[in-house]
């Protein structure tokens, strides 16, 4: 039996994991993001979704502090995924924002547009 190609969602999950590791292994522990790595990832990978936040160093620091639940000044993959979940939820809501059908179910242009 031939291997089935990964689905779009499976590829998206793999991309998120790979992107996290692309930044997490730059300095310190290879499986956590330092403040510098987190800022670099937000600026490069979330530039459209977080365009206001990425220009504000203090806001980036506040976001990291909120995500850093064990207060070790690093973000584990799990802690970082809390941000991804919030962004996905906010993006979903934004897609429905101007739709007269609400969640009835058509999507607009997308987040960051």
Swiss-Prot record:
Subcellular location: Secreted; Cytoplasm; Cytoplasm, Cytoskeleton; Cell membrane
Protein residues bound to Ca(2+) 1: 24, 29, 32, 37
GO annotations of cellular component type: calprotectin complex; cornified envelope; cytoplasm; cytoskeleton; extracellular region; S100A9 complex
Domain EF-hand: 13-48, 55-90
Keywords, sorted A to Z: Acetylation, Antimicrobial, Antioxidant, Apoptosis, Autophagy, Calcium, Cell membrane, Chemotaxis, Cytoplasm, Cytoskeleton, Immunity, Inflammatory response, Innate immunity, Membrane, Metal-binding, Methylation, Phosphoprotein, Repeat, Secreted, Zinc
InterPro entries named in the record: EF-hand-dom_pair, EF_hand_dom, S100/CaBP7/8-like_CS, S100_Ca-bd_sub
Pros-methylhistidine: modified positions: 107
Binding site for Zn(2+): 21, 31, 92, 96
SMART domains, sorted: EFh, S_100
GO MF annotations, alphabetized: antioxidant activity; calcium ion binding
Modified residues (N-acetylalanine): 2
Annotated binding of Ca(2+) 2, by residue: 68, 70, 72, 74, 79
Reported phenotype of the disruption mutant: No visible phenotype. Alters response of phagocytes to stimulation with bacterial lipopolysaccharide (LPS).
Topology in membrane: Peripheral membrane protein
Outcome following mutation: residue 107 to A/F: Reduced histidine methylation by METTL9
Record's function text: S100A9 is a calcium- and zinc-binding protein which plays a prominent role in the regulation of inflammatory processes and immune response. It can induce neutrophil chemotaxis, adhesion, can increase the bactericidal activity of neutrophils by promoting phagocytosis via activation of SYK, PI3K/AKT, and ERK1/2 and can induce degranulation of neutrophils by a MAPK-dependent mechanism. Predominantly found as calprotectin (S100A8/A9) which has a wide plethora of intra- and extracellular functions.
Description of how the protein assembles with itself and partners: Homodimer. Preferentially exists as a heterodimer or heterotetramer with S100A8 known as calprotectin (S100A8/A9). S100A9 interacts with ATP2A2. S100A9 interacts with AGER, and with the heterodimeric complex formed by TLR4 and LY96 in the presence of calcium and/or zinc ions. S100A9 binds quinoline-3-carboxamides in the presence of calcium and/or zinc ions. S100A9 interacts with amyloid-beta protein 40. Calprotectin (S100A8/9) interacts with CEACAM3 and tubulin filaments in a calcium-dependent manner.
Name listed for the protein in its UniProt record: Protein S100-A9
């Amino acid at each position: 039996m031939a291997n089935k190609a990964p689905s779009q969602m499976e590829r998206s999950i793999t991309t998120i994991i790979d992107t996290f590791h692309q930044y997490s292994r730059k300095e310190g522990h290879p499986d956590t993001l330092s403040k510098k790595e987190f800022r670099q990832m937000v600026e490069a990978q979330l530039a459209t979704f977080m365009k206001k936040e990425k220009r504000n160093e203090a806001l980036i620091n506040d976001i990291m502090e909120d995500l850093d639940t064990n207060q070790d000044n690093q973000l584990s993959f799990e802690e970082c995924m809390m941000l991804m979940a919030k962004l996905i939820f906010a993006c979903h809501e934004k897609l429905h924002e101007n739709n007269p059908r609400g969640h009835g179910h058509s999507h607009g242009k997308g987040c960051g547009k």
